[in-house]
Amino acid sequence: MGEPAFTSFPSPPVLGKLKRNMMPWALQKKREIHMAKAHRRRAARSALPMRLTSCIFRRPVTRIRSHPDNQVRRRKGDEHLEKPQQLCAYRRLQALQPCSSQGEGSSPLHLESVLSILAPGTAGESLDRAGAERVRIPLEPTPGRFPAVAGGPTPGMGCQLPPPLSGQLVTPADIRRQARRVKKARERLAKALQADRLARQAEMLTCR
């Protein structure tokens, strides 16, 4: 009797050797973008912040830690600044001088000169009194004074300005009067809308 023939069966595939990625391509791309953004955020947090208010050009800010030997590095011209400013623009404004229409240099206007233009009688008062008291300007034009024209101030003409709204007192009677006006306006609007609606309905019926 002969020996039985040896039959071999194929072995199952080894799963450990398969390195196939089962993640979809779109999800994998989104994961890579998220990881790159997180890496950039970590790198940005480790760097010093940039100051944008003290100068037009960006420069790093000195970090101040609670240590007695720490000193803030600054320039000599910055020691009197109360808050960061745009120093370049500030210096350009300091270099500018007001000029007249003929090109001649003129001194800047002070508060007293402005008050003398608006109300000639208040030029000699002190600034505290001028700030505390409201300047009363008459609404009616006085003889010899004319209202300002739209083209600009004319030499020899006075300036007529309305009184400031902050100086007018609002009474309960004014509030009630305004409420009555609003109510009447709403009633007129409701009547007009109703008449318009009826006219439209009548027009639609006639068109049919």
From Swiss-Prot:
Pfam families noted in UniProt: MBD_C (PF14048), MBDa (PF16564)
Keywords, ordered alphabetically: Repressor, Transcription, Transcription regulation
Keyword Repressor in record: yes
GO biological process: DNA methylation-dependent constitutive heterochromatin formation; negative regulation of transcription by RNA polymerase II
UniProt-recorded Gene Ontology molecular function terms: methyl-CpG binding
Gene Ontology CC terms, in alphabetical order: nucleus
More details: The MBD3L proteins are encoded by strongly repeated regions of the 19p13 chromosome. The exact number of functional copies is unclear, and some of them may represent pseudogenes.
Protein name per the record: Methyl-CpG-binding domain protein 3-like 4
Lineage of the species this protein comes from: Eukaryota, Metazoa, Chordata, Craniata, Vertebrata
Chain's gene name: MBD3L4
